[in-house]
Amino acid sequence: MAFLGGYEKKHKVTIVGSGNWGSTIAKIVAENTRANKDVFEEDVQMWVFEEDVTIAKDSKHYDESIGDAPQKLTHVINKYHENVKYLPGITLPSNIIANPSLVDAVQDSSILIFNLPHQFIRNVCNQIRGKILPFARGISCIKGVNVSDDGVSLFSEWIGDGLSIYVGALSGANIASEIAAEKWSETTIAYDPPPMDNSRAPTPRSQSPGLTMTVTEPPADMQHRDARGRKSKTKLTPVPAEYPPLDHACFHSLFHRPYFHVEMVSDVAGVSLGGALKNIVALAAGFVDGRGWGDNAKAAVMRIGLMEMVKFGKEFFGETVHTATFTESSAGVADLITSCSGGRNFRCARKAVEKGITVDEVEKQDLNGQKLQGTSTAFEVNSFLTARGLEKDYPLLTAVNAILLGKASVDDIPSLVSDTERKQPLP
């Protein structure tokens, strides 16, 4: 996709993180920077947390002269163009530059793509604060939200507030191994261009995803607003006119591939919430599937869960959250379907019921010390709702928490969620 206008500078892109999903995103982005050299610098920096790796004997990169001697992961990626530890068997574009220095990797980059475990966000931001371009913009590929008794916060805003930049979010029914193998899938990118950027090349905005949109003028005060529509405390620096506009068209060209279709929306909160709440619903789907109730029961759980996801978003983020983000986008219903069909939360919940043990016991047996995202999110969301006296308004989310704590059984689910039939229809 060619951008007209003859801009003096191109956007440099850095991927912050190099795990399974981070390397997959780097592959996509590097393919597109190479295809859109009028907009982006071709080389893509990828920050790699340096570690020693040993190349397996059955790998095509195995060197008998080195044998089992450990090698630096960055060296291996740059030499063989493969992340042999986190994305083995997938050839990465040669314009990906693995960099062990976080500060050096982000230097002079106008687009930062974050893809790392959420518990490392604050440390990473502390390391690069004041060392990035002040007008840089970001995309968070970190699924989920942070929920505490105090409130719900978005990881994209953790990053944005920490670095004084604007950050959107990417989420969807995206299994990294399938995308890396170039099996077709969709994703949703939520990016609500700050008014000072949007005034250059306004991005159409609408109440729902899709191509038919209505342009709205940016606020006269050019004040950036957060995901709840409030004036943000973060003061942003406009993207200089020497660069192509960082709008929906630009990010679409950076992420869209023939095998990875991108839908652009403005609802950052909705996209982020979808990636978190679907894990709780997936546990419920696993419970009823493990009980042997079949596809009808699983479909009922998904329908009720989807309604509660929309309600949660509307109740705690207001009109910035759009129903269509949940009902029409990959970040909503598609990710929910994938998670309730074979995701890790679904599988562990199903096994717990089939074996007559707790989900916690399945975690200990099968996950090598890791924890399910669904269980922690279920506890956090329930605590948040209970602190506000709202747990009865979300019967499915509340039922999952009760089952996890042993206060209810799977057999109770139909009666626990029956009052959803009396609730108001989706707006």
Swiss-Prot record:
Pfam families: NAD_Gly3P_dh_C, NAD_Gly3P_dh_N. Signal peptide: none annotated. Its EC number is 1.1.1.8. It comes from the Eukaryota. Residues 200-215 have a biased composition (Polar residues). It catalyses: sn-glycerol 3-phosphate + NAD(+) = dihydroxyacetone phosphate + NADH + H(+). The active site is at residue 278. Belongs to the NAD-dependent glycerol-3-phosphate dehydrogenase family. This is Glycerol-3-phosphate dehydrogenase [NAD(+)]. It comes from Hypocrea atroviridis. The lineage of its organism: Eukaryota, Fungi, Dikarya, Ascomycota, Pezizomycotina.
